[in-house]
């Protein structure tokens, strides 16, 4: 699973997921299913926000890569992926600027057009079950909830899906492709079932014992099958800007 994650996702997303896990004392090499889940969630958050801007009239518009316009403002503020201190700093700044109610839990995004925080969910189960779990945890009508599944289903607060159909279709297609690639490698069942994941982990540990002397360096070459998984939705300027924004706090 770890090899799959490193080949499947943008290196920046992998790096952010590793830092998020280490912040909570978790090891991506051991908890590989969680590693995959965090990377998937991060990518959905980025895809949710990418290409969406607000023009000078306050209208939401979509600008594809290659159509730069310095006057446009990103519609969504990405909160997910930052360390907790920086994330809460961003949330507090948004609340002070806009006057919106401060959430009890860190949300994933802020929508400047609708003036609301958004909680993104990606589930391997039924969307309505996961939605209810999220709603019960957040207990606030101020935070908008949007759940996606690997089967193409989605559910959102008051059936308000925020994004246009094409943008949501990109996310659903990506999730479905990830599921297919996991299944083709025999990884999907353990990703869905915690019990199966524990069984697979024990099996992997046993297999590693007699091979302790073998080289452990992982190849970073991408197979032809995985080239279709490479997230090309992030243009280079956007990637660089996001990377600088997320990682600058680590250098202080």
Swiss-Prot record:
Function: Plays a major role in the shutoff of the host protein expression by cleaving mRNAs probably via an endonuclease activity. This host shutoff allows the virus to escape from the host antiviral response. Hijacks host RNA splicing machinery to selectively target host RNAs containing introns for destruction. This may explain the preferential degradation of RNAs that have undergone co- or post-transcriptional processing.
Active site feature: 80, 108
Subcellular location: Host cytoplasm; Host nucleus
Molecular function (Gene Ontology), one example: RNA binding
Protein name: Protein PA-X
Pfam family membership, one: Flu_PA
Protein origin, superkingdom: Viruses
Annotated positions for site Important for efficient shutoff activity and nuclear localization: 195, 198-199
BP-aspect Gene Ontology terms: viral RNA genome replication; viral translational frameshifting
Domain commentary: The probable endonuclease active site in the N-terminus and the basic amino acid cluster in the C-terminus are important for the shutoff activity. The C-terminus acts as a nuclear localization signal. The C-terminus is recruited to host protein complexes involved in nuclear Pol II RNA processing.
Keywords noted in UniProt: Decay of host mRNAs by virus, Eukaryotic host gene expression shutoff by virus, Host cytoplasm, Host gene expression shutoff by virus, Host mRNA suppression by virus, Host nucleus, Host-virus interaction
Homology family: Belongs to the influenza viruses PA-X family.
Tagged with keyword Mitochondrion: no
Leader peptide range in chain numbering: none
The keyword GTP-binding appears for this protein: no
Principal location: host cell
Site residues by UniProt (Important for efficient shutoff activity): 202-203, 206
């Amino acid at each position: 699973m770890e090899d799959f994650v490193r080949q499947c996702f943008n290196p920046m997303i992998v790096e952010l997921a590793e830092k998020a896990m280490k912040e909570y004392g978790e090891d991506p090499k051991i908890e590989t299913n969680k590693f995959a889940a965090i990377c998937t969630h991060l990518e959905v958050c980025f895809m949710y926000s990418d290409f969406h801007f607000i023009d000078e009239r306050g209208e939401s518009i979509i600008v594809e890569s290659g159509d730069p316009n310095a006057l446009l403002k990103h519609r969504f503020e990405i909160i997910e992926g930052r360390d907790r201190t920086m994330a809460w700093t961003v949330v507090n700044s948004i609340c002070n600027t806009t006057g919106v109610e401060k959430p009890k839990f860190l949300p994933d995004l802020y929508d400047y057009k609708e003036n609301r925080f958004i909680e993104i969910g990606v589930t391997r189960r039924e969307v309505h079950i996961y939605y209810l779990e999220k709603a019960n945890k957040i207990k606030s009508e101020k935070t908008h909830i949007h759940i996606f599944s690997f089967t193409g289903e989605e559910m959102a607060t008051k059936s308000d899906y925020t994004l246009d159909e094409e943008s949501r279709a990109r996310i659903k297609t990506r999730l479905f492709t990830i599921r297919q690639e996991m299944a083709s490698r025999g990884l999907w069942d353990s990703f869905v079932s915690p019990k199966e994941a524990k069984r697979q982990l024990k099996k992997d540990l046993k297999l590693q014992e007699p091979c302790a002397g073998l080289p452990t360096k992982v190849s970073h070459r991408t197979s032809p099958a995985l080239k279709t998984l490479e997230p090309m939705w992030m243009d280079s300027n956007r990637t660089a800007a996001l990377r600088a924004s997320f990682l600058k706090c680590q250098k202080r």
